[in-house]
Amino acid sequence: MTWDVIKYPHVTEKAMNDMDFQNKLQFIVDDSAGKNEVAEAVESQYEVSVVGVNTQNTMDGEKKAVVRLSEDDDAQEVASRIGVF
């Protein structure tokens, strides 16, 4: 299920810079989720178009996904809708 893939938005200073300048959002996701699953979950939950997904495992043992949105979607607007700020 797509609602189980995304745990919560990852909010750091770097995440804010990515959002402002590169139209990217960062999320902590389920450890077993693949890039395609993350893209599908973001597209269905937030009604945006995803161009690319990069994932990495953090030092805390969590999986972080950096999601790049299409130029038609604004990462700041999506972040405000989901309550990042």
Predicted regions and their residues:
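Contiguous, often N-terminal, cationic amphipathic patches that form binding interfaces
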Residues: M1-F85
